Amino acid sequence: MRVAIYPGSFDPVTYGHIDIIKRGANLFDKLIVAVLLNPAKRPLFSIQERIELLKEVTKDIPNVEVDYFDGLLVEYAKKVNASAIIKGLRMVSDFEYEFQMALVNKKLNPSVETIFLMTSPKYGYLSSSLVKEIAQFGGCLSEFVPDIVAERLMEKFKKS
């Protein structure tokens, strides 16, 4: 079975992420969407909330699983028997960092390949940070995230 990991913070998941998830799922028997648990960051959504939202928005993609990890991605790849890491690239500026990470991951675990998928042009500008900023000021989110994500974002910003 060909298994790949699509890692990220997904805080929150956007249509850009979902685009990469669907395309990655078409390339592998199983795609694990893996939420990074990074204690150095202060995410808007808890790890449980991000997992729940990802499960909801991927429920119609049968070969997608949602999980979380901390530590080294290549160690997680070993644990789940993944042979590939999928990374979405929005623009050239993403490539420099992601290429460096791919080389480090290859050095740490030569059996894991990194596959870069270019973001669909209609999502090239989209980021979770941008979505949070729009939500914070009460802007319309329908072009950026599924309804369930927009609802949760608005709830978060009403509380603050």
Curated annotation (Swiss-Prot):
InterPro entries recorded: Cyt_trans-like, PPAT, Rossmann-like_a/b/a_fold
Coiled-coil features, chain-numbered ranges: none
Gene Ontology molecular function: any one: pantetheine-phosphate adenylyltransferase activity
Keyword Acyltransferase among record annotations: no
Positions with a binding annotation for ATP: 9-10, 17, 88-90, 98, 123-129
Chain positions of site Transition state stabilizer: 17
EC number per UniProt: 2.7.7.3
Intracellular or extracellular location(s): Cytoplasm
The keyword Cytoplasm belongs to this UniProt entry's keyword annotation: yes
Pathway assigned in UniProt: Cofactor biosynthesis; coenzyme A biosynthesis; CoA from (R)-pantothenate: step 4/5
Keywords carried by this UniProt record: ATP-binding, Coenzyme A biosynthesis, Cytoplasm, Magnesium, Nucleotide-binding, Nucleotidyltransferase, Transferase
Cofactor: Mg(2+)
Reactions catalysed: (R)-4'-phosphopantetheine + ATP + H(+) = 3'-dephospho-CoA + diphosphate
Single GO biological process annotation from the record: coenzyme A biosynthetic process
Binding site for substrate: 9, 41, 73, 87
Pfam (any one): CTP_transf_like
A GO cellular-component term linked to this record: cytoplasm
Protein family per UniProt: Belongs to the bacterial CoaD family.
NCBIfam families (alphabetical): coaD_prev_kdtB, cyt_tran_rel
Reported function: Reversibly transfers an adenylyl group from ATP to 4'-phosphopantetheine, yielding dephospho-CoA (dPCoA) and pyrophosphate.
Subunit structure: Homohexamer.
Protein known as: Phosphopantetheine adenylyltransferase
Source species taxonomy: Bacteria, Bacillati, Bacillota, Clostridia, Thermoanaerobacterales
